[in-house]
């Protein structure tokens, strides 16, 4: 089941501590205005995968850019993702894209703000993304919005 988390009271936020990509980002920032956490979980005590999403009208090049959210967002930015079970990160991205398209009709672009690591590169390219832009410290991968892949 897909969960979109936008408030600090949700039990799945206890698992933010496991974020291997951007552990320095505080939990309250992840669910503040223009941001949310999406989780794939059958219950609130056992997530399969989690991703943090920020909404913008541009493609951010660095973590500091995540502070600038849009009133009418056109771009969903996946800025950290991790999974507890094989294949569930991919499943979460597909379901999150579909859910965001339904709940945020102004969003028509799906990109990442990924670290420059081989693991991130393999994950996103294997799951159908293209490299949109290489930045100083990050890479923006872009997903096809028609299929969610």
Regions found by a protein language model. Name each.
Residues 1-31:
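Short amphipathic alpha-helix that is part of the acyltransferase structural core
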Residues 26-49, 54-57:
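A short helix-loop-beta-strand connector motif used in the catalytic cores of GNAT acetyltransferases and
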Residues 39, 47, 96-107, 111-115:
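Preference for well-ordered, secondary-structure-rich cores of eukaryotic proteins
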Residues 52-76:
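Conserved acyl-donor/pantetheine-binding loop and adjacent beta-alpha core of acyl/acetyltransferases
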Residues 83, 110-122, 137:
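Conserved beta-strand-loop-alpha-helix junction that forms the acyl-donor binding cleft
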Residues 83-102:
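Conserved acetyl-CoA-binding loop-helix of GNAT-fold acetyltransferases
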Residues 125-135:
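Conserved acetyl-CoA-binding loop of GNAT-fold acetyltransferases
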Residues 136-149:
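C-terminal "cap" of GNAT-fold acetyltransferases
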């Amino acid at each position: 089941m897909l969960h979109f988390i936008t408030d600090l009271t949700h039990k799945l936020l206890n698992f933010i501590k496991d974020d291997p990509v951007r552990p320095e980002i505080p939990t309250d920032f992840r669910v503040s205005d223009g941001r949310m956490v999406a989780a794939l979980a059958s219950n609130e005590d056992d997530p399969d995968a989690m991703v943090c999403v920020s909404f913008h009208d541009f493609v951010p090049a660095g973590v500091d850019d995540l502070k600038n959210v849009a009133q009418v967002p056109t771009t969903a930015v996946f800025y950290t993702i991790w999974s507890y079970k094989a294949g569930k990160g991919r499943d979460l991205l597909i379901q999150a894209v579909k859910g965001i398209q339904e709940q945020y009709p102004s969003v028509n672009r799906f990109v990442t703000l990924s670290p420059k690591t081989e693991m991130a590169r393999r994950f996103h390219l294997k799951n159908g993304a293209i490299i949109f832009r290489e930045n100083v410290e990050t890479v923006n991968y872009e997903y096809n919005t028609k299929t969610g892949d």
